[in-house]
Amino acid sequence: NLVQFGKMIE
């Protein structure tokens, strides 16, 4: 999901 993706690029 988008939350996981956001954490990955941070």
Swiss-Prot record:
Alphabetic keyword roster: Disulfide bond, Secreted
Tissue expression notes: Expressed by the venom gland.
Top-level taxonomic group: Eukaryota
One GO CC term on file: extracellular region
Protein's cellular compartments: Secreted
PTM notes: Contains 7 disulfide bonds.
Annotated family: Belongs to the phospholipase A2 family. Group I subfamily. D49 sub-subfamily.
Complex formation: Heterotrimer of alpha, beta, and gamma chains; non-covalently linked.
Protein name: Neutral phospholipase A2 homolog cannitoxin beta chain 1
